[in-house]
Every structure is written in structure tokens, then in C-alpha cells.
Amino acid sequence: MRASYKGIYKPTYPKKYAGDPNRIVYRSLLERRMMVYLDKNDAVEFWASEEIPIIYRSPIDYRIHRYYPDFIFKLKTGKKYMVEIKPYRQCFPPKKPKKQGRSYMAEQLEYIKNQAKWQAAKVYCEGNDLEFKIFTEKDIGVYS
């Protein structure tokens, strides 16, 4: 399993950030790479990270939870997006190993939970003139 990277992002153009530009947290190198892209891209009018809560019901514990999508941004063309950043392997059901252990069960539960989150995000986007996308390392680029 890959090491997790976490830190505070300091934007080059803080006025483009919709929120507190001193409290932008990234939880992976993919998220950080997306932040740099949104911050420095002239086509982006504004962007935010984990600023809007989406309410969803977990199919695991049947309770209501809050989900904060990784990014929301608006292009100067007027198009608005909500984006979740995930490793490619987490976008599909885990492959069933010959011997099922705890890691397989944890991956399965995480996949089920993510599907519920993403469905709630899609519903939210439909009612708020946003397009929901899931970006992986294949969309953003490999770790560096």
C-alpha cells in the first residue's frame, strides 16, 4: 500500500479560491497536483476544496453521513464541476482473492461506501447545475 501524503496547500492566486485560502488541506499527491492545476490554470474562474457537504445514507450502517467532495470549480466558460479524486483501483469493485481476508473486506466496504457517496453527489449536481466527475491518476498524471 502506498504512503499517504498530507499537507497544507498555499495558493499562488488566493483570490481564485472560494473559501479560506490559508486552510486548504490535501490528503494525497493527486489532490495536491489537482490544486496546483486549478490554482494556476487561467481557464479556471474559481475553485474550492472540501467546502460543500453532501448528505448521504451509508448502505453499511444505514445512518446519515456528510461527504465533502474533493473539489468544486468553475471555468470561465461558465461550466461548473464537482470532482472526486481517487486512485484508479478504488473506482472498481475489488478483485476477489482466493483467500478472503480483512483487507479484501475493508476494500469491499470502502467501495460500497464510495458508490453511495458518488450517487448522492450526482443527485446534488443535477439540481445545482454541476457536472460530477471522478478523476484518477490516469486523468491527473502519475505520482511524482
Residue ranges and their predicted role:
Residues 1-144:
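Electrostatic, structured charged patches in enzyme active sites and in nucleic-acid/phosphate-binding
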